[in-house]
A protein has these predicted regions:
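Conserved phosphate/pyrophosphate-binding and hydrolysis machinery centered on Walker-type P-loop NTPases
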Residues: 10-17, 38, 60-67, 83-86, ...
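Amphipathic alpha-helical transducer elements in NTP-driven molecular machines
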Residues: 3-4, 17, 21-24, 41, ...
Length: 176
């Protein structure tokens, strides 16, 4: 059942046989690491997860500084347990920019960067409709949060905030 599972995973996204072969290759490597000769379904599932994590890590490494700062703000707002709307995330972003001594972009531009991160599969966000009160975008999750955070904090431009606790970047608002 291993090869059909690899084929199914490969077909899920784009129907690409190369993806299936890549999953099978990584599953084989994982099998070797556990000193076995038989690739099992769990190896295939772990391989798929590893490939996804590696893809996200590569994307995060190549992001420009402003996008990395927006991603870090997304991680911090989710970690805080506060309402993870774009407007709340923007407040965290502004504090991060001040700590990093980088220019603060407009909320509209930060929303655009958030949409780009969503399209790249680095974050997951949804649009919430609130009737006559309009709509707002909410950040639901960050793919490979711990790996992404580790990569972000290794970036030399993010060094000034490495030792600062997350709580320092979460504003104290009345509505929070």
């Amino acid at each position: 059942m291993v090869i059909p599972l690899c084929a199914a995973y490969g077909a899920q996204e784009h129907g690409d046989a190369r993806k299936a072969i890549d999953i099978l290759r990584v599953a084989g490597e994982l099998t070797e690491m556990r000193k076995s000769y038989i690739v099992e379904e769990t190896d295939v599932k772990n391989a798929k997860e590893k490939i996804e994590i590696d893809r996200v890590i590569e994307v995060v490494k190549t992001l420009p500084t402003q996008s990395k700062t927006v991603l870090l703000a997304c991680i911090y707002i989710l970690a805080s347990g506060k309402d993870s709307t774009i407007s709340n995330m923007y407040q965290v972003y502004r504090l991060l920019c001040a700590a990093l001594s980088i220019d603060i972009l407009t909320q509209r531009r930060v929303t655009d960067l958030t949409n780009e991160l969503d399209q790249l599969g680095v974050i997951n966000s949804t649009l919430q409709y609130k009737g006559r009160y309009g709509r707002s975008k909410k950040i639901m999750s960050v793919s490979s949060k711990s790996s992404s955070l580790e990569i972000l904090l290794k970036d030399f431009r993010m060094q000034p905030i490495e030792k600062i606790p997350i709580e320092a970047f979460i504003p104290k608002f009345k509505n929070w």
